[in-house]
Each structure stands twice: as structure tokens, then as C-alpha cells.
Amino acid sequence: MYTQGSAFKRQNLTRHLVPLIEVAKHGYVIAIVEYRPTPTGIFPAQIKDLKTATRYMLNHAFEYSVDPYRYACFGDSSGAYASVMACVTGNMQEFSDEDVRFSPLHYRACVDFYGPIDFSRMQEFPTNWDHESEKSPTGLLFGGVNIRTVPDLLEKSSALNYIDSKKLPPFLIMHGKKDRMVPFSQSVMLYEKLRQTDHRADFYALENCDHGSDAFFTPYSLTIVLDFLSNNLKKGN
């Protein structure tokens, strides 16, 4: 399940179609998920939409020739945030539109390319973006407010608050050390929290790479993704 980055606005669903086709050539069925954009798509709409799309694919597994027991999330930027949150919130009802008692989800792996993790700390580190005003991507995600006025949403939206001893899928994290939009420290925090709670995570720091760099979709980078997916989606895992 692939979710495209867009600062939570309307997504260009074909932006990474070429590298995704390369991944599909290795036997993967890829569904590109369009989540509700801001300003109408208010948190946690994006997470709910990803889970709804996943359930749709599982309910049509025969039609799309997919294995309903082996599926993963993959996203970049805001799409990576949705992917990570879908995995760490698991079957919490408040993050699903469907009844989780009858349609539980169990993602087997998560690929996170330079996604935000904790919105309350985005402005602490070097960035050339406004992450806090009512017109910022996060402000619009929260309904058009300054994020400092809604501490409850900041807490609820932080992926770090859902990472504990419960079972989680393995994570592959890739982030550019020169990212000027989503601070590199966001992925560092995610990786450290996963490791502190004894979860599996691989972290690749890309030197001199900015947000959304083509370096993330080179054959070398895609080989890392393919190896990760192969290791974690193979039968018997």
C-alpha cells in the first residue's frame, strides 16, 4: 500500500509511478492510496483512508491476485506519516472507519521515506518551512489552527506515543541528512524509540540529500527496499 507525500494536500498519484513499477516487476501488487487532502481531510482522515484502502484490497484479494496475509505500507513524506501511523496504531478503533472487530489489520512491514513523526518538534531543528501556524501543513491538518493551541492533537498525532511493547512490523527508514522540510531528527527519534522498545528497524541516512531527492528512488535505494520487503513478506515469517 503506497501513500504519496504532498504536505497532506492533494496528491500527485503518479509522481513516483516509474520506480513503483520497478518494484512491481519483482512480483508485488502496488495499490497507490489517495487519502483525503487538507483542508477537508482533517487528522486522522489520512490514516483511516489508508486502512480503508487496505481492507478494500484484502476484501478483493482474489480479484487483484494479492496474498491477504502478506501486505505492507510504503510512503514518502506525509504519505510516510500515514504509513507509520497505520502500523503503530494497529487496530485502535479511533483510527479506523470500519469495525476493527470484524476487519483487523496486520501489516507485515513498513517503509518510511523522510516522514514526519512528532509535529510538536518539527520547528526545533533546521527547516525552511513553517510547521506551526494555522496555514502550515500541520495547522491545516489539525483544522486550520496554530498547532500550539491544540496540545491534545499534538499528543494524539505523535507516532512515538503508540510505540511500546505491543507487536509491530519491522520498519525501514530512509531520510536525507540535508532535509530542509522534515528535519532529519524526526527519523532519528522514530528509530531510537523503535529500538528502545525492542522492535526491528533499519535506518539509512542519505548524506547531502534534501527532502524528496531522486536518490531515494535510484536502483540502489530500491534494492534496499526490495530486500527489506522480501525478507519480511516471505512465507513463513
Per-range role (PLM):
Residues 1-237:
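Alpha/beta-hydrolase superfamily serine-hydrolase fold, recognizing
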